[in-house]
Amino acid sequence: MALNIEEIIASVKEASVLELNDLVKAIEEEFGVTAAAPVAVAAAGGGAAEQTEFTVELSSAGDSKIKVIKVVREITGLGLKEAKELVDNAPKALKEGVAKEEAEEIKAKLEEVGANVEVK
């Protein structure tokens, strides 16, 4: 049951602000994106800026390769073949440009199943 673009737009026009807010949150969670506009940051002369975007890198799968592949699929949304290739070719970046909290969550999930992970 595929919807065409006109039907989707009509549904969005009829939705309340609360429903649209829920839709945005669901899209952000489903696709791992954010609806926030990029903020231009003026370069400060002296101090080093705090890092806000992180890369989660799988260093190695450890002993539980199958469990690591399952978690990689869950985190990235990749298919079985792609997730296996990523794990086999470690070290590889799993997620780039993620918030510190999300990076730490991903690291914890992978380390829980025996993988070696770095957050950069």
Swiss-Prot record:
GO terms for biological process: translation. Keywords: Ribonucleoprotein, Ribosomal protein. The keyword Ribonucleoprotein applies. Pfam families: Ribosomal_L12 (PF00542), Ribosomal_L12_N (PF16320). CDD domains: Ribosomal_L7_L12. It comes from the Bacteria. GO terms for cellular component: cytosolic large ribosomal subunit. GO terms for molecular function: mRNA binding; structural constituent of ribosome. The keyword DNA-binding does not apply. Forms part of the ribosomal stalk which helps the ribosome interact with GTP-bound translation factors. Is thus essential for accurate translation. Belongs to the bacterial ribosomal protein bL12 family. NCBIfam families: L12. Homodimer. Part of the ribosomal stalk of the 50S ribosomal subunit. Forms a multimeric L10(L12)X complex, where L10 forms an elongated spine to which 2 to 4 L12 dimers bind in a sequential fashion. Binds GTP-bound translation factors. This is Large ribosomal subunit protein bL12. It comes from Listeria welshimeri serovar 6b (strain ATCC 35897 / DSM 20650 / CCUG 15529 / CIP 8149 / NCTC 11857 / SLCC 5334 / V8).
